[in-house]
Amino acid sequence: MSFAGRRGMMAAGATAIILGGIAMTGAAHAQECDTVVFSDPQWTDITSTNALTGVILEALGYEQKVETISVPVTFEMLGAGEVDVFQGNWMPAQQKFVDAAEKKGGIENLGVNLKVAKFTLAVPEYVAVEGIKSFADLGAHGEEFDHKIYGIEPGAPANQLIQKMIDAGAVGLEGWELVDSSEQAMLAQAKRLERGKDWIVFLAWAPHPMNNQFDLTYLEGGDDYFGPNYGGADVYTLVRGDFAKACPNVGKLLDNVSFTLDMENTMMGLIINDGMAPNDAATKLLKEDPSVLDAWLEGVTTKDGGDGLAAVKDALGV
C-alpha cells in the first residue's frame, strides 16, 4: 500500500464514521494491516532482519513493503503513521531520536530483537600493530589517516556522534573530516586502502560480515560517545504508536521475533558474499534451521485466523 493509499484509507474510514456514526470495525482494522511497511536505512543487518520477518509475514498472508529511508526520516514517518515497523533501533546510539518520538507519543517499543552487539570505530590490524589501539591514539597520527574518519549515510546517529567528537576537538580530532557515504561505499574504501596498507579508521559493528572480511581492531576509549564495551548495544523493534493495537496478530509476531549474532552474520554473508536476494537468503536460512519458528509463531495465526506455524512450515517446505 502506498503512503497516499494509507492516508486515503484513513480518511475514508473517518468519513464513514462521521456519516454512519459507527466505530471502526474489526474488518477495517484487518484491511489496514494487510500491508506492513518496514524501514531499512540500507544497513545489511536490517535488510536481513526485515527479510526474515517478511518471509514469515508473507507466508501468513500479509504483504511486506520496505521503504529505504534514513534513521531520522524513519522516526518522522513512524510518528506520522507512514511507517509501521523499524527493527533497527540500535541503543543507546539512537537515544535522542527515541526521546523525541516518545515525547510525541508516536512510537511503541516491542523490546529487544538482538543482544550483545557492538558499534564503534575500528582500524585494520596492520594499523593497530603500529600502536593505534584507542581513540586517544588517533589525534597524533592525523597525517597517516589523512585526517579522515569514514562513516555511513548522512544523518545517521553514528555519524552525528563522530561529528560531535570532531567539533569538540575530542582526543585530538580538531580539524578532522567525517566522510559521509554509505555502508557499502565505506567498506569499499576500506578494502581499497587495505590493498596498499594505507591507514583508515572507520565505523564498524557486529553483527556484520566485515568482521570476517577484515582483520579489525575495535578501538578502546570511546565510552563518552559510543558507550561502554566498544559501543555495546541492544537492538530494539519499534512500531508506530497504534500499530500493535490495530494489528495485534502482526504485533504478536514482531514481539516474538528475535535474532542472534550467528543468524544475522549468516544472513549478511549470503547477501553480501553470495549475492543472494534478501528474501531468498531468509528462506534458505529458515529452511535449513527452522528451530526458531515455534517461538516466533507462538500465539500467531494466519491473516485469516488459521494455524500460523503450519502455514509457515508449509510455505517453507519444512
Short names for language-model regions:
Residues 76, 83-87, 157-224:
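Ligand-binding pocket segment of bilobal, Venus flytrap-like solute-binding proteins
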Residues 118-128, 232-246, 269-270:
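A bilobed periplasmic-binding-protein/Venus flytrap-type ligand-binding module shared by bacterial periplasmic
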